[in-house]
Amino acid sequence: MPHLRHEKRCPAPVAGVDEAGRGPLAGPVVAAAVILPLRGVPRGIDDSKKLPAAERARLCGLLHRRARVGIGIVEADEIDRLNIYWATMKAMTLAVEALGESPAHVLVDGNRLPRWGHPATAIVGGDALSLSIAAASVVAKHTRDTIMLAHAAAHPQYDWHANKGYAAPAHLRALTEHGPSPLHRRSFAPVARAGERFADVLMRSGHTASG
């Protein structure tokens, strides 16, 4: 279970930072920054991947009420322009800036740090080790899932309500059948390939219709 040992080694306030959505073919990458309260930390915080959706939603609500939370969102078109690595770094930077308070130290999940002026420590597997990072993982994951569920209503053919933009079989089939949407990351190889195939199908069908 994540703990506060890393936080206690750092000057306060300490923010934990994590992201959700580096791997999907569609939708934004979302980062969250969380400064936990001195008292009243919600119980049950863990790596978001270990929690069911309902528990993530419950904890996210509690964290927004009890902790200081910042969220950074970088959309698909900017991911294509920057690449996913730099888009993730930007989302993390935006999340810390959105805290409304400058942390004395930042704990970041992973092995890379954004180019910012904050004293920071990267912790591999930090969402399973640091309570602040775990809290950020919950907020980032729930926030991104909520965004993708809203997009799913407008684009039901891609099955985003189930796959949240990841490369599930139904999503890949829909990409081939319908082509990419404006929310797809066209710099990602499966999306680029599907776009080329779809354009080819349209071209052939157009020639058939005109012939």
Label the predicted regions.
Residues 1-211:
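RNase H-like, Mg2+-dependent phosphodiesterase core
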